[in-house]
């Protein structure tokens, strides 16, 4: 039996001479005694331990109290209820799979040696070995989690041999499925599923003629000499994992706390290294540092101190488990606070060469993690006083109700192999889109959701197509000053992102089978398959008395009846699409008032832009007709489907000044004093004094000239006899679009599909500007007269916020 209660496996090393495997059990009665809360104070890290771990002395060495043990027992039971501990059968299965994989790489090393001219006897002595790292090595893996593995080979076996010869062996193995190679990754990797267990396999070439059979760890820095940079990066995973286990004072307590922290990060939507949050290693380093500061504390105390410390941590002050070891002139680069001062949240790995494990963190993701630290600190304080439970800490996030606007990125492919490559490539580049969006004026935050979704909404039209969707929440920072500029141009952010995607697509053998579509959507337009990812949005209800005085049945409150008067006019999202056909939509809206009647026709046009493997150079710039936006006074009612509420928040983003309108007796809305828009970024409780919020409506139009013709906002607010303003609802009037004809205004509405052939043959009616197609999205809100105003003069309406996205061809 190994240290964790599982059987040892021959020929499998896990980079440690003291711990050879990391397995846990599922049921509480099956947990090994070393992980039992009742034995936490008797294991490594007792109160008389003189060793000081870390770069500073501990904050407290006090032993756990009886309350700490009680809370730790409750924590353990909560983690078991989330099925975080795998069964002994699955643990044995993992060990068996690792044994098979180890035997495969040994045989592969022999074959490569024979092919390169080594004698039979010498080739038989040349071995390759498998090491584990990551969550499996740390002992915090759960059912269905993957195993991070490292293959170490001698100096004559190249990385090309690993990705060619070994790949050929693995892909035809009967127990291996979903085989994929990612050669151009930061750390080149082979991913596969071996008998139902996901495995990531990387390779490192050591400067040795043969790998010793007795090699059990890779801590010795001599292994880093005379090897390539990719091998150093590959070795770093095992070396960091070993160092973490050596630098924590109590391994069982560390594991229990880390399991909770990882589950919390996943459920709160902040677990993803590739998208700018933190990965498993970074969360382990943060937890290990708290264990150093409180070496004798129980897991429940460690978790509370975790949030308490990082709630007030002054980023970018680095997190260090040990002092950084400087490298020589010719040695590998080591993290330097002066050279790497642009890093926002440095968490430094303890093994030489020290690196920042969080270089992908962005302004938006850091802000969200900070708010989650604050939330966690508040809840854990209440857990200690009995006001909350551990399940309150582990509640799902409200990402899909938190923001008013989202970007949806759909990745299309025609087979599983292409889907894994295409989806992985796009996901790995989303951080560049985030960075570009953050640098856009008026953009405050662009927050990704760290998970892709299988999207089957297209199956009716193309059942063979595979689609994965990613989402980002957007927050804008508009000024409340009347007349202030409220336009946002996302041209650069989007075109640079699509350019990176197309560059890779051109290198693929079948680029025509892989598409991407980007949509800018409102919260109420989110697809149904994301609804299970968080708490349901509350539905406001009201009781209306009948003419007899009896209360009628409860129903959804209409928008026109809401106290905050969220005026909505559903529009279609802007899309950049490959090989899709838009539908024709001709909605007509008629708005009547007591003083005038206005009829407006709305045209919504979707542009379809193919992204092909070869660039086009003869694309003429489209033209644009003037688009008029008229805002008539309206007494029309809004359907209950538009009654979307905004989740509570403590982080507000000043936007335009929306109205706070009350319904009149005839059904129209009268406005009160304007208030600022709150766009939620956290799930914290709202300010109880704030009782009004607004929904920014999105309107998509396709302008067809590049002349100085702009949309006009006509304020038709009507003043009632009592001096209050009557709420008006915007109506969009858009011209028809034909890319092959001169643009003229028309009263009919049409939808044009812009194909690659049409773009190439379109006449040039204006000077080409970057050879792009322009899609303009208008976010409209109204300005109202304060009900307390002494005069009937209305204030100048603020400029409408417009978000322009220019898609490259």
Curated annotation (Swiss-Prot):
Binding site for ATP: 133-135, 146-148, 200, 262, 271, 280-281
Known catalytic reactions: RNA(n) + ATP = RNA(n)-3'-adenine ribonucleotide + diphosphate
UniProt-listed InterPro entries: NT_sf, NuclTrfase_I-like_C, PolA_pol_cen_dom, PolA_pol_NTPase, PolA_pol_RNA-bd_dom
Localization: Nucleus
Residues that coordinate or bind Mg(2+) 1: 146, 148
Compositional bias of kind Polar residues: 26-50, 656-665, 707-735
Keyword Cytoplasm among UniProt keywords: no
Keywords for this protein: ATP-binding, Magnesium, Manganese, Metal-binding, mRNA processing, Nucleotide-binding, Nucleus, RNA-binding, Transferase
Annotated GO CC locations: mRNA cleavage and polyadenylation specificity factor complex; nucleus
Biased composition (Basic and acidic residues): 530-540
Binding annotation for Mg(2+) 2: 146, 148, 200
UniProt GO MF annotations: ATP binding; metal ion binding; poly(A) RNA polymerase activity; RNA binding
UniProt-listed Enzyme Commission number(s): 2.7.7.19
UniProt cofactor(s): Mg(2+); Mn(2+)
A Pfam family matched in the record: PAP_NTPase
Biological process according to GO: mRNA processing; RNA 3'-end processing
CC cofactor note: Binds 2 magnesium ions. Also active with manganese.
Main location: nucleus
Compositional bias ranges of the Low complexity kind: 12-25, 572-655, 666-706, 736-760, 785-794
Protein family membership: Belongs to the poly(A) polymerase family.
Role description: Polymerase that creates the 3'-poly(A) tail of mRNA's. May acquire specificity through interaction with a cleavage and polyadenylation factor.
PANTHER family: POLY A POLYMERASE, POLYNUCLEOTIDE ADENYLYLTRANSFERASE
Protein name in UniProt: Poly(A) polymerase
Organism of provenance: Dictyostelium discoideum (Social amoeba)
Gene of this entry: papA
